[in-house]
Each structure stands twice: as C-alpha cells, then as structure tokens.
Amino acid sequence: MLAMLWSVAVSTLQAQGTESEDLDAKYATTLVKPGTEAPLVKTLKTIDGAPFQLESLRGKVVVLDFWASWCPDCRKDAPDVVKLYQTYHPQGVEFVGISMDTNVEAWKKAIAQYGIEYLQVSELKKFKETDVAKAYGVNWIPSLVVIDADGKVLLPTVLSEKVGKLLQELTSK
C-alpha cells in the first residue's frame, strides 16, 4: 500500500513538473523572441501619469512583468516576482510592472496589497487593446520578459521560476 502511495505521489510530482514546463509551450508562444530588440512602446505612463520610456533603462538588465489586479494567476505569482525584485534589484537588475488594468484605483490597491516596490506603468486600456501587449505578443498574463543591457530580449516566459534561474546565472558571473 505504501509503495502504491509513493508511486502516485511521484507520478503526481512528475506530472506537475511536466505541466509547469509545458506552460511556456502553451502560453508563451506569441511572446517576443529571444535575441530580438525589445520593442520601445511610447504609450506607457507611470502610476502618477508621467511618461515612461524603456530606453531610459538601457545599460541594465530589465525584467518586464505583465500583470493585472483582476488576474488570479498574476495575484498568485506576485509574491514570487516581489521576491525576485528584492533579491536581484540590489544587484542592479531593474523591474518594471506593466499593468493591464483599466482602473487606476484597483491597480494602486493591488500594488499596496502585494508590497510591490518596483516601477509600475500602464496604458489603462483593456488588455488586448494596449500597444504594449501587441508589441510584445502578450496574450496571457502573467508574462515576463527579461531584456539584456543592450536592449535585446533574453527570455520570454510565463514562469517566474525561469526568470529566477536566469537572473541567478547573470548575477553570479
């Protein structure tokens, strides 16, 4: 009986690992491709309404975090992304949250609720209508895109753990 339970547990864990690996195959296929120039979208504004230009972060590794307050998977992923920020920002990695919210108050509330300290920008438009989602090929959130210091896409993914592994490699060199 114990052997059977162990077998089921191992099978379940293996299935979860496979499911996790397959999430990029399922949800990240339309994201910008590695090696391409990161699109420079001119319509993003900070939570205070100031214009944001991605090129202002040139020279640094940047993690773009596409999310929304109304997105259950984003809320589930938020603590992990906050931990990545807390770990890698002191090492020079910049994080930019790109919200797909249309309601600024809901956006502000989620930022406070999850203790998000990194820069937040948005177009305050419906997800599929935003220039930034179109430019980056974002059809699913949360999505993350890691950009190198030269403005090239290193990693498009829906898995924060992949971002963590890449940042660990980049900062340990």
Regions found by a protein language model. Name each.
Residues 42-62:
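A short beta-strand-turn-helix
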Residues 1-19, 173:
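Bacterial Sec-dependent N-terminal signal peptides
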Residues 76-114, 125-134:
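Structural microenvironment flanking redox-active thiols in thiol-disulfide oxidoreductases
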Residues 58-60, 90, 116, 138:
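Active-site acidic short loop of glycosyltransferases
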Residues 58, 66-83:
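Conserved redox-active cysteine motifs that mediate thiol-disulfide chemistry
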